Each structure stands twice: as C-alpha cells, then as structure tokens.
Curated annotation (Swiss-Prot):
CDD domains: KRAB_A-box (cd07765). One of its GO terms (cellular component) is nucleus. One of its GO terms (biological process) is regulation of transcription by RNA polymerase II. A zinc finger (C2H2-type) spans 134-156, 162-184, 190-212, 218-240, 246-268, 274-296, 302-324, 330-352, 358-380, 386-408, 414-436, 442-464, 470-492, 498-520, 526-548, 554-576, 582-604, 610-632, 638-660. SUPFAM superfamilies: beta-beta-alpha zinc fingers (SSF57667), KRAB domain (Kruppel-associated box) (SSF109640). The lineage of its organism: Eukaryota, Metazoa, Chordata, Craniata, Vertebrata. Residues 28-100 form the KRAB domain. May be involved in transcriptional regulation. This is Zinc finger protein 573.
Length: 665
C-alpha cells in the first residue's frame, strides 16, 4: 500500500554543479518517499491502515537516518507521528506543487563554492544545513532544505477563500468551514451506536469508539498504564521523569503539558468560560463542567464488575478498581508512600516541598490545589449549590453531597480487615487504617507532636500561631478552621437534623451521631498499651495517654497554664476574655462555652440518657457515667508519682497532691 525505502536506494539523484544548480538537486529525501493525507482522506482509513501508515513512515525515516547520520533533520510528519498526532495537516492539502518552475519561483539560491560531483551525501547535506541555501523571497528568511522553505512558504501563498459568516474566520476548504460551522449551530451528525452520543465529525466519533472497544496500544514501561494515543503516553511519562517544560510567567510554576499551563493561567486571570445551564455555576475547565453536570442528571454509566458500584466517569472507575487490585503505581521517592492516582501523588509531593501557591484573598489561607481554594471560598460566600433530594440539605461541593447521600442509604462498602469497622468512602477507610499501623508521618516543628493526616497537622499549627481566621457574624467568635465555624453556626440556629434511634437524642452533625451511637453498642476498640484501658474513640485514647506521659503541650499565653487538650485551653482562655455569649433561653443564665450551656439545659429538661448497666443509675453526661462505673469495676487510673497511691478521678489526685506540696512547705 505504501512504498518502503530500502537503504541501498539512498544516494544522489542528480549531480551537483554550483554554476548550473537546478531546483531540488539534493539527496533522496524523506519527501521523495512520503505519502501525505488530508484530514478528510485520513478519516476514511480504518485503524489498521492508520497503524500501517505510521509503521511505514517511521521505518522510512529510520532507514534515512541510519545512512545519513544525525545530520538529517526530522520531518514534521515524523515528529507528529511520534507524538501520536494525526498527519492531515502535512503538505499535500496545503501546497501540492507539481510544476518545477512554480517551485523555483519561490526559491532564491545563495551562491556557494564549487564541490566535486562525487562529494559524499553526508558532507553535502551538512553543507546545505550550514550554508542555509534556501531563501524566501517574501520575507528573506533562510532555510537549510527546499522542503522546509516550501513548508514555510505556505503561510504566504495559501488561499483561504471560505469565510464563516458568524465569526469571520477563513478556511482553506469547504469541508473545514462545514466542520467549524457546527460549533455555532451545535450540529452533531455522527452518532455512536454503542451509547448514542453525537459528534461533530467522523474523526471525533472514531476516537470516541476506542473507549468502548478498550483499544489502548501505547503502554507505559514504568507503571504499565495504557493509552489510546501516543501523545497521551508522552504526557503521562513526564509524571515519572518529572519533565515540566511549560512555565507560568506569573508565578513560575511549571507544567508537563501546555494545556495544563493554559488552564492554570486562568487562576491569575479569573477566567471561567464554561457555564452550567442548570444552576449558572462557572468553571475554568470544560471537564469540570461535564463532571458537575452529572450531579444534576445523576447519570452513572460506568459500573464496577467486582462490587457493582457505579461512576460518572470512566477514569473514576479505573481508579476505583485499584481498591480491589491493591495497585499503587505512583510511589514517592522521598518517603516510599504509594498512590493509586497521579493527582494524589503530585499533591503529596507538595507536602515535602511545602508548596501552597493558591491564596484566599479574604483570609490569606493558602492551598496546595486550586480546587481546594475554590471550595474554601464558599465558606466566605455561603454559596451552596448542591441540594439533597431526600432532605433538601444543601452543600458547597458535589463530593460533600455524595457523602451525605450515604447517610440516607446507610451504604458502607469499605470494611477494615483489622477491626471490621465499615466506611462509606474508601478515603475514610485509608485514614482509619493508620490508627492500626500507628504511622504518623507529619510532625509539628513547634512541639514535635506527630499526626497521621497532613490536614490535622495544619489545624494543629493554628494553636501555636493563634490564627483564627473564621469569624461568626452572629456573636463574633473566631475559629481556626472553616468546618469549626460551620459547626458553631448551628448553635445559633439550633438545627439538629440527626436523631439517634436508640434514645431519641438529636445532633447537629452526622459525625456526632455516629460517635454517640457507639455508647449504645458498647464497642471500645481502642486500648491503652500502658494500663489496658479501652476507649470508644481514638481521640479519647490519645487524650488518656497524656495522663501517663504528663504531657501538656497547650499553653495559655496570658497566665502560662498548660493543658492536655486544645479544647481545654480554649475553654480556659474564655476566663481571661470574661465573655459569656451563650445564654439559656429558660432562665437567662449565660455561659462562656456552648458545652457548658448544653450541660446546664439538662437541668431544665431532666434528660439523663446515659444509664449504668450495673445499678441502673442514669446520668446526663457520658463522662459522668464513665466515672461512676469505676465504683463497680474498682478501677483507679490516676496514680500519685510521690507515694504511688491511686485514685478514681483526676480531681481526687490533684487534691491529694496538695498534701505533698504542703508537707514540703
């Protein structure tokens, strides 16, 4: 079908003479054996014919290089084929010269010294390149080969007689104009028989159909990931090599793809050209708009064969399947941690580099990802575009709505193999598993405290800086995190949509309900290795462990008093502030903390949901029940370091320690 150039065919096809130099007297070039296609012609080739074309063209080029050496310049079509791009833009459609006189009219030769006719092909070509013999008469630009000049000359001579009446853009062919006009009309005449999706051109349909057939001929040698296009694998391999040739002139950030740079630049310009027709929300990326649109339709066409879970996008299914296979192709060279997706891997690397290029203009908080900045900004605007159809509750992001919807279905497909606890999201399971491994990669430089999650470290660091950027507009109270502010706002509205089916107690957050329900089940999976005491919650275990170490990392800047918990420090600081923003509606008594108010309100309601299983005594607080149970168990966890005496309560130990201090005095 296509001519393959044999090595012995390479040679001089015309003798060289400086005085009577005729047009294109040079070596047999790649152009002599190349076959060119227009875009329209290319669409009629089936995939096997296209693969054959690529193989033949690349082999021809390799044969030329093997004889001509490195001095042979890479033709444009070869560069395109190697990068997985389609070759319809090559010379044939644009300038198909058949008359030598026409070719000579656009070429002006520069006088060069005389060479013998038996000069070697390599020497002759290197002379051509060094001397740049071909000059454009239009702009005087010089080129080392006639082919390069002809390719350049197309920009001067190509006619574009077909004009779009909508926008004035010109095209070389009526076919190109027809394709372009479909952007204005929205016409998509090519339909996929598999899924019914429509496309503007046959080429787009052919590309789309590969997603149904699963055809992926280009495989990454590093991680085994396969791609439909060679250009995609070139972009992907930069993840492994770290190559980032595209740099932003605004902030200096570099990218592996030019398209990523263009999208990134919208962060600086604020451009969001893609608008949702349903809710009016705008996006900087078309892919984000498409993903967002599926929240309105609730369409999930991609289904996991292992567990039946459905996804909106094909790549989400691919990533999900790694949960079943355990595959983590992206490994951090700094700490050895593996990731299922490149995006998580790149995000993790910023932890080591400390890069947070995205800053909120309202509160100056910085973020590693732009999408995290946009989500955060909703805290200031209060915008909530995603509504639950079950209960009408709204959320700032689609992912939060997705998480919330599982509270109605009760779906928890991800189970911990260590303790059997189940989770609604795979990310929650991964976080939970760190409790069993005890891994704490993230250390606070101020107090050396370590954390299993990076976000917990960043929250903790606000204790040292004292930053409280999120202020309640009702009472003026400030918080170090937006989530704490959202929780606090519910104290003013009194909203408690989550109800315990066991005792009827209601909660403002679903997480609080989950914590509360563990009291009824009696499960205490977290055990102290020092005294074997067990706890319902991991945070209670960590708090308890500070009793053994006597660690109190949280210090009041006013009086120097130290505390085991940041919440205790916050409660203490209200003593210095002398503010009591929380008032009881029954009797008017005011309190410094919301927790004190809720405790007080039980006096009026008489609610005592926590009952002792031994004697039936009821308590208004779970902590009071725990203290009471020590009477039955005989447990005395508080030990005096001076004399070894043990106590049931921390307050009793403190009172006892005063005896030793008074004796010393």
């Amino acid at each position: 079908m296509f001519p393959v150039l044999e090595p012995h065919q390479v040679g001089l096809i015309r003798s060289y003479n400086s005085k009577t130099m005729t047009c294109f007297q040079e070596l047999v070039t790649f152009r002599d054996v190349a076959i060119d296609f227009s875009r329209q012609e290319w669409e009629y080739l089936d995939p096997n014919q296209r693969d054959l074309y690529r193989d033949v063209m690349l082999e021809n080029y390799r044969n030329l290089v093997s004889l001509g050496g490195h001095s042979i310049s890479k033709p444009v079509v070869v560069d395109l084929l190697e990068r997985g791009k389609e070759p319809w833009m090559i010379l044939r459609e644009e300038t198909q010269f058949t008359d030598l006189d026409l070719q000579c009219e656009i070429i002006s030769y520069i006088e060069v010294p005389t060479y013998e006719t038996d000069i070697s092909s390599t020497q002759l070509q290197s002379i051509y390149k060094r001397e740049k013999l071909y000059e454009c008469k239009k702009c005087q630009k010089k080129f080392s080969s006639g082919y390069q000049l002809i390719l350049h000359h197309r920009f001067h001579v190509i006619e574009r007689p077909y004009e779009c009446k909508e926008c004035g853009k010109n095209f070389r062919s009526g076919y190109q104009l027809t394709l372009h006009q479909r952007f204005h009309t929205g016409e998509k005449p090519y339909e996929c028989t598999e899924c019914g999706k429509n496309f503007r051109s046959g080429y787009q349909l052919t590309v789309h159909q590969r997603f149904h057939t699963g055809e992926k001929t280009y495989e990454c040698r590093q991680c085994g990931k396969a791609f439909i296009y060679a250009s995609h694998i070139v972009q992907h391999e930069r993840i492994h090599t770290g190559g980032k040739p595209y740099e932003c002139q605004e902030c200096g950030r570099a990218f592996s793809q030019g398209g990523h740079l263009r999208i990134h630049q919208r962060v600086h310009t604020g451009e969001k050209p893609y608008k949702c027709k349903e809710c009016g929300k705008t996006f900087s990326r078309r892919s984000n708009l498409v993903e967002h649109g599926q929240f309105h339709t609730d369409e999930k066409p991609y289904i996991c064969e292992k567990c039946g879970k459905a996804f909106r996008r094909g790549h989400q299914l691919t990533v999900h399947q790694r949960v079943h296979t355990g595959k983590k192709p992206y490994e951090c060279k700094e700490c050895g941690k593996g990731y299922t997706t490149a995006s998580y891997f790149l995000l993790h690397q910023r932890i080591h580099k400390g890069g947070k290029p995205y800053e909120c203009k309202e509160c100056k908080k910085t973020f590693t990802l732009y999408r995290n900045l946009t989500r955060h900004q909703n805290i200031h605007t209060g915008e909530k575009l995603f509504e639950c159809k079950q209960c009408g509750k709204t959320y700032t992001t689609g992912s939060k709505l997705f998480q919330h919807q599982k509270t109605h279905t009760g779906e928890k497909p991800y189970e911990c193999k260590e303790c059997g606890k189940a989770f609604s999201l795979y990310g929650y399971l991964k976080q939970h598993q760190k409790i069993h491994t005890g891994m704490k990669h993230f250390e606070c430089k101020e107090c050396k405290k370590t954390f299993t999650l990076y976000r917990n470290l960043t929250r903790h660091q606000n204790i040292h800086t004292g930053k409280k950027l999120f202020e309640c507009q009702e009472c003026g109270k400030a918080y170090s995190t937006g989530s704490n502010l959202i929780q606090h706002r519910k104290t003013h509205t009194g909203e408690k949509p989550y109800k315990c089916k066991e005792c009827g107690k209601t909660f403002s957050l679903h997480g609080y309900l989950n914590q509360h329900q563990k009291i009824h089940t009696g499960m205490k999976p977290y055990e102290c290795k020092v005294c074997r005491k067990t706890f319902t919650f991991y945070r209670n275990l960590t708090l308890h462990q500070s009793i053994h170490t006597d660690e109190k990392p949280f210090e009041c800047k006013e009086c120097g008093k130290t505390f085991r918990r940041s919440s205790h420090l916050t409660a203490h600081q209200s003593i210095h502030a002398d503010k009591k923003p929380y008032e009881c509606k029954e009797c008017g008594k005011a309190f410094k903390m919301y927790g004190y108010l809720t405790q007080h309100q039980k006096i009026h309601t008489g609610g005592k949901p926590y009952e002792c299983k031994e004697c039936g005594k009821a308590f208004s607080r779970a902590s009071n029940l725990v203290q009471h149970e020590r009477i039955h168990t005989g447990e005395k966890p508080y030990v005096c370091k001076q004399c070894g005496k043990t106590f049931r309560y921390g307050s009793a130990l403190k009172a006892h320690q005063r005896i030793h201090r008074s004796i010393k005095v």
